[in-house]
């Protein structure tokens, strides 16, 4: 992922080893800094052997910096992106999520199909309501991945969340030799 983002921006981007954990869904807003914090969310649905939703959540500073690098212009308001900005954000999220999806696919020996990404800028609580509405009766845990990017002498924390359907979470953890209670 860092290699692809570096190539896109023509600049070295370092990605530290991510922190990955399974957490209760209701803990996610707090881990993101609060339900009211504004994030840019890129959402991808996965299907086939593993079903659920991946979300790549970027803070406003990281979004503005990436767009500036990708588009070569100053971004005034990341909350109201134009079509070119949306496309660039979607591609960034697609690269990040698909790097984790490909790793899961290989590690679990599963085929995983990915939807076209969609993008929205809103408060974290609102962004998280999308998958919760869909999966409310299916499960209440998610894979929470914290990523730290370093470029331009700055450090940015972004998150990838995987909200699997309950059966997919059980199958994934069973395949990894972990128990699910």
Task: Please give the residue ranges for each predicted region.
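Composition-driven recognition of glycine/serine/threonine/acidic- and proline-rich low-complexity segments
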Residues: 1-181
